[in-house]
Amino acid sequence: MSRPAKLALLCFGVLIAVAIIFSMRGPQLVLQNTMPSVVKTVTGKLPVLAKSMPAFADITRWWNTPGGQPLTPASLKGKVVLVDFWTYSCINCLRTLPFLKSLYAKYAPSGLVIVGVHTPEFVFEADPGNVDRAIKQNGITYPVALDPSYGTWNAYNNEYWPADYLFDAQGRLRETHFGEGSYDETEQSVRSLLGEASSAPLPSPGVVDTTPNFSLIETSETYFGLERGAAFMGKVGAQNEDVQLTAAAVPAADAWTAGGTWRFEPQYVETRAPGDVFRFSVQASKLHLVLGSADGNDKTIDVYVDGAAAGSVTVNAPQLYTVATFPGGGRHVVELRIHDAGVQFYSATFS
């Protein structure tokens, strides 16, 4: 085989390998301390990235639509549409809600529609009752679609929470944005597309910006279950089996440890006896935990920060709980003394 032919074959093999790697990537939360690029043009006019809007595929329930009826690309023609992929236990997604709600309140009368596509990260987020509660708790009034089997997610080839896809009144994709921030740019893009669709005057610009100070966040998002568990100091138990653990007195930086009787499951770890202990060394200004109750009853957790009592948390519904706050950031050891069996720990996020 000639040298050029061998080189071509090698390049083809590399491309195939890269394609396989990317096809195996699962859904991802956008890293809290990085901001993916927003698609823009130097002329200020948004490019056409795709000529049509994908269908809302495999949606099992709609909220905030007339009669709970589904929306379609055809029914949205003539509107500027922002499709926002989110999930209710994701802190990054929750931090975007004040912006999205203010954007919708200001520009819906001018022709903006926001569609929140709720694609679950955890099993409990596929439950319509849990999603309904989250919509009400967060005061969301724009349409929301439940995408439990990732039909719409896959139709968009999406990979991230949160992820925004902005369509013009003709149904063409004009901009994408992944992660938090750049809210003023998104608002300007919405105004630009509304201006293309109509000459009617728009309200003055200005929306809520809740972008956090990422420089205070050192500890990465951490998962606890067998599927994606990381940073654990201790013996990992087999699925569906109780394991006795001894907690390290002081965890390593950005690591967690546990003491007492615990059970490891694919998406979470669960306390199995009263008096179990959880410790985590974190550097951030807030620690949030995605927690649930195995039987749905209230579970009580006492919180200690650097050895000092810092309140308590009552866990019932599976959702994000703010467990500890550290003004000014810095490194701290958070200890949770758990009164009840059946507290499920899914993940930790920071702000």
Name what the model sees in each region.
Residues 55-81, 104-107:
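A short beta-strand-turn-helix
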Residues 76-79, 109, 140-141, 158:
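Active-site acidic short loop of glycosyltransferases
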Residues 136-141, 146-189, 325-327:
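Thiol/disulfide oxidoreductase modules built on the thioredoxin-like
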Residues 94-137, 146-153:
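Structural microenvironment flanking redox-active thiols in thiol-disulfide oxidoreductases
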Residues 69-94, 100, 113-115:
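Short active-site neighborhood of thiol/selenol oxidoreductases, capturing the structured segment around
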Residues 2-39, 43-62, 184-351:
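Non-globular targeting/processing and membrane-anchoring segments
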